Each structure stands twice: as structure tokens, then as C-alpha cells.
Curated annotation (Swiss-Prot):
Role, per record: Functions as a positive effector of cell expansion through modulation of auxin transport.
Keywords: Auxin signaling pathway, Cell membrane, Developmental protein, Growth regulation, Membrane
Induction pattern: Strongly induced by auxin.
Membrane-topology descriptor: Peripheral membrane protein
Species this protein is from: Arabidopsis thaliana (Mouse-ear cress)
Domain of life, per lineage: Eukaryota
Name used for this protein in its record: Auxin-responsive protein SAUR21
Oxidoreductase keyword on record: no
Record-stated family: Belongs to the ARG7 family.
Subcellular location: Cell membrane
Length: 88
């Protein structure tokens, strides 16, 4: 019986971890040129000039009509990782 409760508890944790909503304090962004990948970034990045430059690029390309339904940053994934790794 304990094993069944343990398995049910694990299922609840997995379903919560795959939720589409970003956790408190984070923003979900989609990054990539052809294949988009979802990243969660801390809200504190929004005040950083280098991250704001990525947001400006997104605004220039998409305006406020993002094809993924969320914020899309049109740059190569490695560029995004390079920029955000400097912010940590």
C-alpha cells in the first residue's frame, strides 16, 4: 500500500513540473530561429541591458504578435545561452 501511495505522489509531482505556467519569479521565453525551445528566465533579467537588447530584437521582428503564443526571441540558441550566462 505504501508503494501505491509513493507512486501516486510521484505522479502528482511530475504533472506539476510539466505545467505550462512559469513559476513565480520567472518568465517563459521561446528561443531559436527555426526550432524553438522554451526557457525560463528570472524576472531580474528584464532590467539587464543585454537582455533588453534581445527583447528589442524580438519587438523588431514580431511586434506584439508572437507566433508561439508567448515571448519569442529570434536568435540562435547558443547566442541566448551566451548572453544569459553572463547575467548569472
Amino acid at each position: 500500500m505504501a508503494l501505491v501511495r509513493s507512486l501516486l505522489g510521484a505522479k502528482k509531482i511530475l504533472s506539476r513540473s510539466t505545467a505550462s505556467a512559469a513559476p513565480k519569479g520567472f518568465l517563459a521565453v521561446y528561443v531559436g530561429e527555426s526550432q524553438k525551445k522554451r526557457y525560463l528566465v528570472p524576472l531580474s533579467y528584464l532590467s539587464q541591458p543585454s537582455f533588453q537588447a534581445l527583447l528589442s530584437k524580438s519587438e523588431e521582428e514580431f511586434g506584439f504578435d508572437h507566433p508561439m503564443g508567448g515571448l519569442t526571441i529570434p536568435c540562435p540558441e547558443d547566442t541566448f545561452i551566451n548572453v544569459t550566462s553572463r547575467l548569472q
